[in-house]
């Protein structure tokens, strides 16, 4: 079956909206179009960490699973993310997140032997750098500043999820990329 990003986004929003109340509701969708509830967004985030925002992330992360992955593939940008379940976080992260991005980047422009050797070393030894078996928790999956809606310095909600069950510290790491870091 050919991956359809619109269907995937709709399924992801349906899943999240059955459990949480800060993702846009689906108004209508088909394989070519997804119409969701409008969230007013002036991009004006609070100068201090917003508790509603942090509590919402915590609510996402309280939903857990026995395995790492998700019931269907999702996406980040134009990249389809395989979410086939695995019982080990290091394997899931290496096989389903890092390796595909590495292969895509290397196919676009060969990074050379030195960089390829270093990346392959990291991929083969990832279990030495990250926990093997943290509790699989639901993640937004694409949590960056553009997917967090603020209006009038108040948290409104999240958009554009690429959800899967993974290690929640991955999402915290995304938030550290903010300028300035948000947590």
Predicted regions and their residues:
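Structured catalytic cores of enzymes that bind and process phosphorylated ligands/cofactors
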Residues: 8, 14, 23-27, 59-63, ...
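Active-site Asp-x-Gly
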Residues: 82, 87-94, 103, 135-138, ...
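Short, solvent-exposed loop/turn segments at secondary-structure junctions
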Residues: 29-33, 41-43, 98, 144-146, ...
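Helix-rich C-terminal or lid/interface subdomains of diverse kinases
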Residues: 2-3, 33-36, 99, 114, ...
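Generic structural signal for hydrophobic residues
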Residues: 9-12, 122, 183
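An alpha-helical support segment within catalytic cores of ATP-dependent transferases
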Residues: 65-138, 151
């Amino acid at each position: 079956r050919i991956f359809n990003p619109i269907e995937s986004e709709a399924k992801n929003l349906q899943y999240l909206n059955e459990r949480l109340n800060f993702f846009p509701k689906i108004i209508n969708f088909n394989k070519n179009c997804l119409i969701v509830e409008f969230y007013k967004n002036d991009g004006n985030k609070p100068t201090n960490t917003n508790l509603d925002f942090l509590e919402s992330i915590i609510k996402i992360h309280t939903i857990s699973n026995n395995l790492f992955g998700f019931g269907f593939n999702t996406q980040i940008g134009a990249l389809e993310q395989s979410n086939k379940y695995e019982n080990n976080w290091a394997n899931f992260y290496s096989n389903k997140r890092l390796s595909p991005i590495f292969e895509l980047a290397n196919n676009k422009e060969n990074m050379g032997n030195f960089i390829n050797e270093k990346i392959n070393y990291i991929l083969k030894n990832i279990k030495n750098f990250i926990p093997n078996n943290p509790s699989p928790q639901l993640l937004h999956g694409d949590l960056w500043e553009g997917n967090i809606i603020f209006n009038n310095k108040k948290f409104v909600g999240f958009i554009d999820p690429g959800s899967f069950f993974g290690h929640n510290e991955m999402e915290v790491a995304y938030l550290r990329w903010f300028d300035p870091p948000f947590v």
